[in-house]
Amino acid sequence: MDADKEKDLQKFLKNVDEISNLIQEMNSDDPVVQQKAVLETEKRLLLMEEDQEEDECRTTLNKTMISPPQTAMKSAEEINSEAFLASVEKDAKERAKRRRENKVLADALKEKGNEAFAEGNYETAILRYSEGLEKLKDMKVLYTNRAQAYMKLEDYEKALVDCEWALKCDEKCTKAYFHMGKANLALKNYSVSRECYKKILEINPKLQTQVKGYLNQVDLQEKADLQEKEAHELLDSGKNTAVTTKNLLETLSKPDQIPLFYAGGIEILTEMINECTEQTLFRMHNGFSIISDNEVIRRCFSTAGNDAVEEMVCVSVLKLWQAVCSRNEENQRVLVIHHDRARLLAALLSSKVLAIRQQSFALLLHLAQTESGRSLIINHLDLTRLLEALVSFLDFSDKEANTAMGLFTDLALEERFQVWFQANLPGVLPALTGVLKTDPKVSSSSALCQCIAIMGNLSAEPTTRRHMAACEEFGDGCLSLLARCEEDVDLFREVIYTLLGLMMNLCLQAPFVSEVWAVEVSRRCLSLLNSQDGGILTRAAGVLSRTLSSSLKIVEEALRAGVVKKMMKFLKTGGETASRYAIKILAICTNSYHEAREEVIRLDKKLSVMMKLLSSEDEVLVGNAALCLGNCMEVPNVASSLLKTDLLQVLLKLAGSDTQKTAVQVNAGIALGKLCTAEPRFAAQLRKLHGLEILNSTMKYISDS
């Protein structure tokens, strides 16, 4: 056998070995191995096609013929090799076609499984997911979905197996790690559970908030597990309070006793709950269910107020729940995740019986002391009823009102509460509008301020602000409260200041509820500009800067009220925030009325105050200052008086700067144009500085705006 034939034979044998291995791998039970084999086969076929094309393109350059041409004979090895590869190619194409068909079937089975899962039919869901996996073994979502269904049936070991298969399909499958973490948590493999959750963070750092919550769940459950072990040991050792707690729960589990029997037993039990051991034993021996499922006690809660004994039972239960939930996250969780208890707690906050209302509020405060407790409140309580109940405490004593608003503040800072608030604002807006109708003379001023401040903070979000601003009753409520507070500005200083903050946010939303509303708001703010309080002055100017442009009628009233003089004083003595509002008001006034321009010139003869603002780092301030200066150029002889200043150079720099906002460039360009029109000598200077080109480039912004 010559060298070429030997080489071809070795190549053929190598191909046979490799192809045999590929066929074995394609028949593997491991979907990952199977997928790699399919990809490798496709790669080999591609290379074979390239080789064939290359062979077809070869031409013989030496055309000398010594003997007649003979038909090229292929060796048996070559024929067998090509036939084998052809069969592999055909098989690969058939497999690809079957895979596409199976993908469609697997997707359909996945949807059926999801429907069954949503209906709570977890066995059927598992069956459908399994059928889908028979069609497509490397579909990771079927493994994670089936794992979730197994979790619902508390078959955690099978769930873990499915998660492992999902990770074989995709080693960065965060869903698989999530379900693995949950399953290991249920199996009390706390360290393994933590590692699973931390792996999610490694794969996707953006899930930090969620992972933090998962890890917190692991910590809490491990802590509860240790508490139960210790409680068992103390009970077995015969500790007096532990044994008494267990015995009292057995006594209270007796059905159909008179209400006084339960009230007395619960009060004794409450006195026994002094430590974590007793709290844990209460939970371990189904204390929550013994109390909340008792028909007599349930009847007392539903009819409380008709009978003193029934009221006593309700109060005693609420005090017991406070005792068992104090600084005990697991007991808090068990109490609140039960739907009936969560609904009852929200309802009791609005009870007509003062004692019940106060004790249910005290229980809520116990829950809200920790982050996990606040999460329980947000996730499980009826937040609309809760919010309505909290604002109703404004009618209570200063201490209770402030405590309620403190709780409202804590909840409002939680991101999940904010999401809920935006989605449910139409339902809670009437309660918030009711707050604005409160008489400040009879309510706690500090608590009222807290409540309005919460509304102000929440209104910073555009969707929330849009709903609030669109509600005519809410806007009228702001006005009426402001009017009542103006009767004694010194007494209600904090309320006015906070309310103006809310109204500033509302005035960001255009158009306003009505022009009439905007006019009335402006009048109130013009009146408040006579205040001696710096904070009120600044915020009144802030509101006015947002309402003034809505109507010429308002501008006229503002001019008659001496707003130009007051705003010029702001510019000379106020801080940056006050100056920002003042220059915007002056820009609006000078844009519409010649007398406003003349008064600015009279109060700032060389326009030095205005020109100083052009060097500010605040672009809004600079833009409005340029606009105001441009308006003032329409007053005769003003432009001529500025020939010895560097105003032209400053405006030119602003108009040509790419670092400035478009509004600054446009306003500076307009001011330049008015300056050169009013005083031709400025136009000559502009030409020398090649400023016309800059002005031309600025014009494109004006035409686009």
Curated annotation (Swiss-Prot):
UniProt entry tagged with the keyword Repeat: yes
This protein's record includes keyword Metal-binding: no
GO cellular component entries: centrosome; cytoplasm; cytosol; nuclear membrane; plasma membrane
Stretches forming TPR repeats: 106-139, 140-173, 174-207
Record PTM Phosphothreonine, positions in chain: T71
InterPro entries given in the database record: ARM-like (IPR011989), ARM-type_fold (IPR016024), TPR-like_helical_dom_sf (IPR011990), TPR_rpt (IPR019734), TTC12 (IPR043195)
Tissue/organ expression: Expressed in testis and in epithelial cells of trachea and bronchial tube.
Localization terms from the record: Cytoplasm
GO biological process, one term: axonemal dynein complex assembly
Associated disease: Ciliary dyskinesia, primary, 45: A form of primary ciliary dyskinesia, a disorder characterized by abnormalities of motile cilia. Respiratory infections leading to chronic inflammation and bronchiectasis are recurrent, due to defects in the respiratory cilia. CILD45 is an autosomal recessive form characterized by onset of symptoms in infancy or early childhood. Male patients have infertility due to immotile sperm.
Job description of the protein: Cytoplasmic protein that plays a role in the proper assembly of dynein arm complexes in motile cilia in both respiratory cells and sperm flagella.
Protein's name in the database: Tetratricopeptide repeat protein 12
Organism the protein comes from: Homo sapiens
